[in-house]
């Protein structure tokens, strides 16, 4: 299995003709070139597992995705793609990502790949993308990831100056029709917005309400940021969601430890994939494409 992620912006530079040569200068070209070399060497990857932002579907009016899919077809791969949301896989985060699963037609005789769209309360996989999907999946709350209140340093409570700045900026953006600004959540919120690599700067995309204590909002701690992506970072007062993944993988017993500075931890977690989504997708790849 060849896994990869790549930015879509470089496709805007050269213009598109929908083919392998047209991907030059992009990170996707490097992925495609590695695959081509493996094919030429007689050891083609059976499966390609690619991840990108949801916006890839509409980037350059869909031409970027068409070029990528045409390249996969040119290399001899059948494929399926769809957008999955982490909030349906047992983590309280609204994080949509586009996944492409491709299989080498000369080796893997599958006719299609069925995506998992969520995890049910009993741990089973949901394969139907229905309008009521949110009612069928494992329930979460933002407080599922919280560290004990008495263990959270005052460092994470934002300053008066920053809080006033967030509020003023949101007012201006709303008046200008931009719709951007801070997002405030509490312990009963079903899920948060998407955490990004820039979270370390001001935490504006996910702030935790502390008005009941007479305090300004706070940022997530690095541990909470990791848990939001599904990392099993153990702490006092927190339990790993039992049904987030019940497949009995050995990795379920692994505990993650943050060994980098706070800023780097935020950056890495913001750039990460949501672990439960990847684990469930990986299981489906094995069952549907590698075992047949």
Regions found by a protein language model. Name each.
Residues 158-292:
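C-terminal target-recognition/interaction regions appended to catalytic cores
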Residues 6:
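Glycine-rich, N-terminal phosphate-binding loop of Rossmann-like dinucleotide-binding domains
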Residues 9-194, 198-200:
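Class I S-adenosyl-L-methionine
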Residues 1-3:
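N-terminal Rossmann-like NAD(P) cofactor-binding module of classical short-chain dehydrogenase/reductase
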């Amino acid at each position: 299995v060849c896994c990869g992620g790549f930015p879509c912006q470089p496709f805007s530079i050269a213009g598109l003709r929908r083919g392998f040569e047209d991907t030059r200068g992009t990170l996707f070209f490097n992925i495609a070139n590695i695959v081509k070399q493996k094919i030429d060497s007689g050891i083609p990857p059976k499966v390609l597992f690619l991840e990108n932002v949801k916006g890839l579907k509409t980037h350059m009016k869909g031409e970027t995705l068409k070029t990528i899919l045409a390249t996969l077809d040119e290399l001899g791969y059948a494929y399926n793609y769809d957008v999955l949301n982490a909030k349906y896989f047992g983590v309280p985060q609204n994080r949509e990502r586009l996944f492409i699963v491709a299989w080498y037609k000369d080796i893997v005789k599958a006719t299609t790949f069925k995506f998992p769209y969520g995890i049910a309360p009993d741990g089973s996989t949901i394969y139907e993308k229905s309008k009521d999907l949110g009612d069928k999946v494992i329930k979460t709350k933002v407080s599922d990831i919280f560290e004990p209140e008495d263990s959270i340093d005052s460092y994470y409570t934002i300053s008066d100056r920053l809080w006033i700045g967030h509020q003023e900026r949101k007012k201006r953006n709303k008046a200008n029709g931009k719709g951007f600004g801070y997002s405030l959540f509490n312990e009963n919120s079903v899920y948060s917005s998407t955490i990004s690599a820039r979270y370390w700067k001001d935490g504006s995309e996910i702030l935790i309400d502390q008005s009941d204590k007479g305090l300004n909002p706070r940022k997530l701690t690095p541990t909470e940021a990791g848990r939001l992506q599904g990392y099993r970072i153990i702490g006092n007062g927190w339990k790993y969601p039992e049904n987030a993944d019940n497949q009995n993988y050995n990795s379920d017993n692994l505990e993650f430890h943050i060994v980098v500075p706070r800023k780097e931890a935020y950056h890495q977690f913001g750039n990460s994939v949501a672990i439960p989504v990847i684990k469930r997708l990986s299981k489906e790849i094995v069952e549907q494409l590698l075992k047949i």
